[in-house]
């Protein structure tokens, strides 16, 4: 019996090693890996430059917490900021944590509470992430959910009319391509309507790029295809 908590439905494939776009199981069978660690290893498994950089860092400093300055962390943040519409970077452990931080920031910065998200969206399995997710199956068995989230049809520029004069909107949160929801790309017309709505309501626009960021759609971030800011 496994001692691992079964949070995922794992395949019966035990990986022994990986290189480039291939993984090999304990029996020596090789697989072409189209998943790449859910796009974490999108440079390929065991890329020489990445492996060398990790080894070098392990010989220097492992972890000293956020109580100390870290020049390499600052350099990485500057590079990320230079290729995005933002000026500041929050390093975290997962997409769900990033979304939690964005939700907290939106409410704290605006003083408002409502977050508009979309049907078939996926924003994580923490409580705020599940609450933001527009799929009931993700939430089954975990209620009651965190309040303040409202769901609209995705890719429908007219959907915002349903909100009328509703106020207290802190942010609109969306994926430029819905991943878990079925690989649904947003249209330029829809995203333009989203940005106009945010400006009208003085709400923040949160773009969840967990699956589309870092060059996976041809630009550094997918929102850059549409001139969003």
From Swiss-Prot:
Chain residues that bind pyridoxal 5'-phosphate: 95-96, 122, 208-211
A GO cellular-component term linked to this record: cytoplasm
Note from the entry: May also have succinyldiaminopimelate aminotransferase activity, thus carrying out the fourth step in lysine biosynthesis.
Lineage of source species: Bacteria, Bacillati, Bacillota, Bacilli, Bacillales
Gene responsible for this protein: argD
Domain of life: Bacteria
Assigned protein family: Belongs to the class-III pyridoxal-phosphate-dependent aminotransferase family. ArgD subfamily.
Reactions catalysed: N(2)-acetyl-L-ornithine + 2-oxoglutarate = N-acetyl-L-glutamate 5-semialdehyde + L-glutamate
EC number: 2.6.1.11
Cofactor(s) of this protein: pyridoxal 5'-phosphate
Keyword Acetylation: no
GO aspect biological process, one term: L-arginine biosynthetic process
Assigned keywords, A-Z: Amino-acid biosynthesis, Aminotransferase, Arginine biosynthesis, Cytoplasm, Pyridoxal phosphate, Transferase
Keyword DNA repair (UniProt): no
Biological pathway: Amino-acid biosynthesis; L-arginine biosynthesis; N(2)-acetyl-L-ornithine from L-glutamate: step 4/4
The protein's assembly and partners: Homodimer.
GO molecular function, a single term: N2-acetyl-L-ornithine:2-oxoglutarate 5-aminotransferase activity
One Pfam family in the UniProt entry: Aminotran_3
Cofactor binding: number and manner: Binds 1 pyridoxal phosphate per subunit.
Protein name (record): Acetylornithine aminotransferase
Subcellular location: Cytoplasm
Binding site for N(2)-acetyl-L-ornithine: 125
